């Protein structure tokens, strides 16, 4: 008997925070990171079972260095009909690197446990899609762990990095993030710094995607002028639908 049930196409997700959630859970319990929570169950939108039920085929797994602010307060404020949150302060390189390395190691441990496959080429990605393996693209959200000479970037690339967002919603050596503000235009402040422009060129030359999410409008156009690769915003939305400072206008 033929089923009339709709077939769910495989979903490739633009962004998830599994790595930072696993890292933060280890800190809160003052214990080693338990990657098996990915299988046994995690709070939030994603874990192995939720992925299976939802047809999740793969996505961008973000390495993100949190700001030392009260995220609960921020989340509460962002539920208001109007809000304007100041940009968090910059995070120093020596503070960012250990956190980023730990989250990259978590992703590798998940691969070693057989939970997913870190993909560094389109051929690897297609193989995962064909064989039902979860495909993971290692992504850095906010380039705080990257030094001006890009030595760290070279090492992260060796570890599997294939995507980077120059900024999160805070300033760093490479650019100026857009604040969490609603309603608001994204045309807020300067774009990429000179180092940020060098970063775009270096990533273009080394097969690392530049993610436009969290850049302000000036930063978006800086990347558009410099990069010879397709423009990608992994987790931004349409400004005409929701006039948030992070969303993209029709222009």
Segments the model singles out, each with a brief description of its role:
Residues 1-186, 243-251:
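N-terminal hydrophobic targeting/anchoring segments and the immediately downstream early-domain regions
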């Amino acid at each position: 008997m033929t089923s009339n049930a709709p077939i769910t196409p495989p979903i490739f997700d633009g962004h998830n925070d599994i790595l930072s959630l696993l890292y933060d859970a280890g800190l809160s319990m003052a214990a080693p990171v338990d990657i098996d929570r990915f299988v046994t169950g995690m709070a939030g939108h994603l874990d192995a079972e939720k992925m299976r039920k939802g047809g999740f085929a793969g996505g961008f797994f973000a390495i993100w260095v949190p700001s030392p602010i009260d995220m609960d307060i921020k989340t509460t404020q962002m539920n208001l009909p109007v809000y304007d949150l100041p940009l968090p302060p910059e995070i120093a390189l020596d503070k960012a690197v250990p956190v980023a390395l730990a989250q990259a190691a978590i992703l590798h441990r998940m691969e070693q446990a057989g939970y997913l496959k870190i993909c560094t080429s389109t051929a690897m990605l297609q193989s995962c899609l064909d064989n039902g393996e979860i495909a993971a693209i290692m992504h850095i959200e906010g380039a705080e762990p990257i030094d001006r000479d890009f030595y760290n970037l070279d090492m992260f690339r060796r570890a599997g990095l294939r995507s980077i967002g120059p900024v999160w919603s805070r300033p760093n050596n490479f650019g100026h993030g857009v604040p969490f503000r609603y309603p608001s235009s994204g045309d807020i402040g300067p774009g990429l710094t000179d180092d940020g422009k060098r970063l775009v060129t270096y990533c273009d030359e080394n097969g690392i995607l530049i993610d436009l999410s969290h850049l302000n409008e000036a930063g978006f156009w800086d990347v558009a002028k410099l990069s010879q690769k397709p423009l990608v915003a992994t987790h931004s939305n349409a400004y005409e639908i929701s006039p948030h400072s992070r969303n993209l206008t029709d222009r």
